[in-house]
């Protein structure tokens, strides 16, 4: 089917070819004018330090590997724009699609189209929840760190530092995202029975929103002596730290965050944060290699987990002093 369409494309009008090139897409059949394999990257777009580092790393890795990658970011977690970009890549008959989804559901129809067109899909960072059996066939592999592991590390830090139990809060990302669910699952897997979460609220990955939410929670639960805040990303943790400082509680409330950006590590060194769990964004090479291997007919692992680490103040200072952080 794809070969037949490619033959038709070779006799298409020059105007049509110019139109396709102008919108940054591939020619029918999957190969660009340069002869490179074409890849469509359905991306989240601007969303903080992790996202910027991750998406730049993926783009660079595919360029270095000799692919013709088209980057299509959305804005404000707009899933409909992502779906439109995904479907356009299918219609353009790219050789592969990289999907970093804003939502974990709602992808069945698009993935089914990709499966029918025999276009392999590689999910990165966030998993998608697919019900349709045909749609599932499109997904070759998932590449990214383990969000469950990150949540488990947060719980184990609280358990270790509060063996007699503690009260605290959880600041979550936007509702419905697999990353939010998985980090919450990890927390639940490991947290001790004498650790009480007074309330969980979404602060939508935002520093400003987290500052406001945390200030309200600290006031609401003042009599419960909150001792920890688990923020599901660095930006929210930094906002929580501002609220804790404003309330005169710096050093009395431990703040745990996930991502491992330079700003968070510096805040850890400065004593504003207590523990930072890395969610390693640098896996462009692994993603490009998985796509290349699959297109070359090789077997690819279904779940390619990227290793991450944890930081206390000492290891954060070492990482910053050595300038080893890419984000």
Curated annotation (Swiss-Prot):
Keyword terms: Cell membrane, Lipoprotein, Membrane, Palmitate, Signal, Sugar transport, Transport
Keyword Lipoprotein found: yes
Molecular-function annotations in GO: carbohydrate binding
Lipid-anchored residues (N-palmitoyl cysteine): 23
DNA repair in keyword set: no
Gene Ontology cellular-component terms listed: plasma membrane
Source superkingdom: Bacteria
Signal peptide: 1-22
Knockout or disruption consequences: Mutant is unable to grow on fructose as sole carbon source.
Annotated function: Part of the high-affinity ABC transporter complex FruEKFG involved in fructose uptake. Can also transport ribose and xylose, with lower affinity. Binds fructose, ribose and xylose, with fructose as the preferred substrate.
Assembly behavior: The complex is composed of an ATP-binding protein (FruK), two transmembrane proteins (FruF and FruG) and a solute-binding protein (FruE).
Protein name: Fructose import binding protein FruE
The organism's taxonomic lineage, starting at the top: Bacteria, Bacillati, Actinomycetota, Actinomycetes, Bifidobacteriales
Gene behind the chain: fruE
